[in-house]
Curated annotation (Swiss-Prot):
(2S)-2-hydroxy-3-oxobutyl phosphate binds at residues 85-86, 127. InterPro entries: LS, LS/RS, LS/RS_sf. The lineage of its organism: Bacteria, Pseudomonadati, Pseudomonadota, Gammaproteobacteria, Pasteurellales. Keywords: Riboflavin biosynthesis, Transferase. Forms an icosahedral capsid composed of 60 subunits, arranged as a dodecamer of pentamers. The gene is ribH. It comes from Actinobacillus pleuropneumoniae serotype 3 (strain JL03). Pathway: Cofactor biosynthesis; riboflavin biosynthesis; riboflavin from 2-hydroxy-3-oxobutyl phosphate and 5-amino-6-(D-ribitylamino)uracil: step 1/2. This is 6,7-dimethyl-8-ribityllumazine synthase. Gene3D superfamilies: Lumazine/riboflavin synthase (3.40.50.960). The keyword ATP-binding does not apply. Catalyzes the formation of 6,7-dimethyl-8-ribityllumazine by condensation of 5-amino-6-(D-ribitylamino)uracil with 3,4-dihydroxy-2-butanone 4-phosphate. This is the penultimate step in the biosynthesis of riboflavin.
Length: 153
């Protein structure tokens, strides 16, 4: 029985990152964490392109454009949606998640879901580089690993 795993070497890989501007004080930290992790694992900064979109709802469209361009080994999607007093949160979270997942399945390109969906601002801050780690960094690791798993198959 073969065990297929992916290493964490990003040398020679190209990444697209789609980041939402809404809640950018959190998303800037997610983006920095992702880029830092990609570079630490061998990616060349010149092989990392970033696109900014208005909010999490708009991420899937740009992720799909990147995924179908043939330029990227993986696309990382970063954003933050914080629950408010209306149901808007539910719609944005659900559609962003569905859209991002659909892009990966439709294109065969790894598309990593790095949209924080939190109950409050404190939870978002915790996941952007404080006590709960940096989810942008974790998404970058996931992107590297899944690209290498797919190459090994």
């Amino acid at each position: 029985m073969a065990k297929i795993t992916g290493n964490l070497v990003a040398t020679g890989l190209k990444f697209g990152i789609v980041t939402a501007r809404f809640n950018d004080f959190i998303n800037d930290k997610l983006l920095s964490g992702a880029i830092d992790t990609l570079v630490r694992h061998g990616a060349d900064e010149n092989n990392i392109d970033t696109a900014w979109v208005p909010g999490a709802f708009e991420i899937p469209l740009v992720a799909k454009k990147m995924a179908t361009s043939g330029k990227y080994d993986a696309v990382i999607c970063l954003g933050t949606v914080i629950r408010g007093s209306t149901t808007h949160y539910d719609y944005v979270c659900n559609e962003a998640a569905k859209g991002i997942g659909a892009v990966a399945l439709e294109t065969g390109v790894p598309v990593i879901f790095g949209v924080l969906t939190t109950e409050n601002i404190e939870q978002a801050i915790e996941r952007a580089g404080t006590k709960a780690g940096n989810k942008g960094s974790e998404c970058a690791l996931g992107a590297i690993e899944i690209v290498n798993v797919l190459k090994a198959i």
